[in-house]
Structure formats: structure tokens, C-alpha cells
Amino acid sequence: MNRVTIRVPATTANLGPGFDAFGCALGLYTDVTFEETDSGLEITGCDEAYRGPDNMAYTAYCAVLASLSEEIRGVKIHIDAHIPICRGLGSSTALLVAGAMGANVLRGNKLSTQGLLNITNAMEGHPDNLAPAFYGGLTASMVEGGLPVTVSFPLHPDWQFLALVPDFNLSTPLARSVLPEQISRADAIYNIAHGALVLKALELGDEPLLRTAMQDRLHQNYRRKLIQDYDAIAALARTNGAAFCLSGAGPTLLCITRSKKLREVLTEKLPGVTRRSWEILPLHVEFQGAHVLESC
């Protein structure tokens, strides 16, 4: 085998109070093909600025080969990305995961999924996105002793996820720069309690509980100021029964509901509360994590 295509799902991190811990895989994908050659690097399917050796798929590919003490020969990489870039849906994570898994498959799957998670977490440091991208479904992660630890949680089958993707991006460094260096004990307790109930509400399909539990005091109140019309959109979603949160660091906004009518309501009423353009993406939870799409 010298050619493999890896499919990686989009991910949404935090889910309100689960800051840097919770993540969920969603049904939107990036496919990356790796074909070994004798020498050189060729990357297609992305902007010219991302076709060099600092491409995240390539750096993860090389990191896995280095961990296996394997020679890094030439490679052709083709990226077919359907995850919006810099929108809080794990576009960078998808490239890292694809690169790591692609290298591992081409070398006979010598590393476990946990091993790949360890390597990519050392590169990015965000297991809240990496874990659901590798494992699928809903996960909670922590880092202990420098290594990520992940647990999967059940989800009620009736949840509908609507991602509201704006016509502007927001970099993660900027979104982190507005966060306070210290928090109060009361805010820490608030998020711990709400986070625990988010997981239970998602399991039970309890929409009123999820709507309340998805409140947070650690990041969303600071980041909302970077997103035009955040408050108006949040009020619209919650008034119509949905739980609401930032997707990752934003600017994508996430509505979670059991109602099949919310998309229609948002399509009709969203233009009345914002002058920006927002694409409404209905997404299902993807329970299959990164995997081989085809190989030869």
C-alpha cells in the first residue's frame, strides 16, 4: 500500500461550560489523500499559502513517521476540505488527525488510536477537539502527566444540531486573548456543576435541562463581544426552545434541539436580528471517528 485517503469529521468543542474538555464529532468532513513518492512534497486542494512543509497534515504525517523511526520520503497530499476554515468547527484538527492516521496506515498501523492522540496532542494541545475527531461521538478529555485521557459519553438519538456559520472568521489566538488570567471560585463551581448536567441532559434528551446547563462563565461571556449580533441570535435560539453555545472558540454558533422546525424558524427570523450573512448547517452527530475511506 502506498496510497490512502483518510476521512475526518468536523468537531465542536466546549459545548458551553465544558471549556477545553468537552467535544463532539459532527457530520461534516475533510478527506485527505496521501501518496508516497520517492522524494519531494506536493500539496494540492488548498490555497497556495498552505502548500508548504508547515501544512498541518504534513507536519502530523512527519511527526508520526519520526515517532516510528521511519524514513520520511516524498509524499503527495490532496486535501478535499468541507469543514469551514477558522470557524470553530475543527478544520485544523481535521488536518492533524488525517496526517497522523495517514502516516500510521501507510506504515502498517503500528500505533494505536491513543498513540496517535498522544502525538497530535503534543503538537496542538487541544484534546477537546482531537478526541472526538479520532473516536467520534461525544467525549470529555483532560491532560494528565502530559498525556490526554478521554472518555466517551452517550447521546440521545433525537438531538438536532444546527451550526450557524458566519461570513467572517475568528482566530483561536484572538479568541483566547480576551479571556481573563484568573477566575473566581464561584465561577469555577458554576462551570463544574453546569458541565456535569450538560452531559446528563445530552444523554437523556432533556431539552429544558440542556438549555439551562449550557450556560457558562469561563469563556463565552468574553468571546461574545467578538461576534456581531451574538446576543440577539442567542435570544432568538433560546426563545424557540434550543440550547445555545459557541462552537469552539467561535465564530460559529451552535443550536441543539429536538425540534425539527428550528431550522425553518431560524431561516425566517435570523435576517431580522442580524445584518451579517449566516449559513445554517443541519448536522448530525458522527459516531465514527477518523477512518480510512479508501486505500491501494
Task: Describe the function of each predicted region.
Residues 28, 137, 165-170, 217-218, ...:
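Glycine-rich beta-alpha junction loops
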